[in-house]
Amino acid sequence: VDRYGPVLSVQIGTAGMEALRPQIQALLQQVAGVEAMVWRNDTGARELEGLPREVSVAFGEVHEPVWIEENGARFGIAPISGQKTGWFYDQRDNRAALMPWVRGARVLDLFSYGGGWGVCAAVHGADSALCVDASAPALASVARNAEASGVGARVRTLQQDAFDACKALREAGERFDVIVVDPPAFIKRKKDAEQGALAYRRIN
């Protein structure tokens, strides 16, 4: 369960919890006191449990983006159309821990998604942040978030595969003081272990 101001984004991945879905929704609606709730039940783990993948609004109305503040920066979240449940809250404390080290630095944010690392770094005094992602919508959100946070002039975007971008930046002689590598899961199943391990070694 992730909360974005007046909106909850909820994901169920197991058949046991799916059976309790009506009760879960009723309790969250009662306890959280929010205006809307989204079911982000589109994870591949549901297929292993024989459950359909779906995204739906449980109640209320959701108008994207929904704005939140994290570590002094503003981010427009897409609970319905974004990745995962809309944002990666699990890295919030790690992002905060990095901020004392970024003042005056050139920052490279690989697999940036909405710029959680790069935009925060710019807000905390980085000279510049380059956010790299293969997704055009993700990079559009980076630009929007940077402008909303007052650091649009110091945040750039590059739409490219992160592996290819690293090679191109190295060949161009680019140098960075801080590099953030926050990739998606390369090993989602046991059969992915060998190739996934190679990918982690390559990107690091």
Predicted regions: what is each one?
Residues 60-204:
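Rossmann-like S-adenosyl-L-methionine
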Residues 2, 18-88:
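Non-catalytic substrate-recognition/targeting regions of SAM-dependent transferases
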Residues 11-16, 94:
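Secondary-structure transition/turn motif
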Residues 1-13, 76-77:
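Short, aliphatic-rich beta-strand segments
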